[in-house]
């Protein structure tokens, strides 16, 4: 039964493409704590490095997460939860990627034994659509100081400013995380590195399949 639940969740997550809140704007905004990507001489985006490793914009989200030495625990959790296909396929997604240290605070049960709960936790870190720093700032401004981001798990992450230059995320339990590295661009979305784990509410939800 648990395998069926996980498989069903993963399949639904893979189908959640598009429909993100807000849109990328051409308007200029103040830079955030991390420097924005620069352009190389050929006009291609250059991503920030993670743990000394290059994050190539021509890769998909899963490939860059796998390449990051700071996200080995996240890679294992994504594989166990069955969400890897969603992050290497088509569509556009935003991933809020907790570091190994952030995930080390979770109990062993959450990371290994309860696969259905693990799938929910991983799906809560993924938002349909491309929310780079500019799009996040736009959504926060349009939301009167906060943006509610619907995740593929079905829950909501709240984004708001933490001081003049940083975005803070709050989960459904009231826990918060800062974005430590912004705007790691991939061919199927964008990744932001976060310094704490964010979790959905305990109550199970039905994941939308469209």
Predicted regions and their residues:
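Mature, structured domains of secreted/extracytosolic soluble proteins
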Residues: 22-210
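Gram-negative bacterial Sec-dependent N-terminal signal peptides
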Residues: 1-25
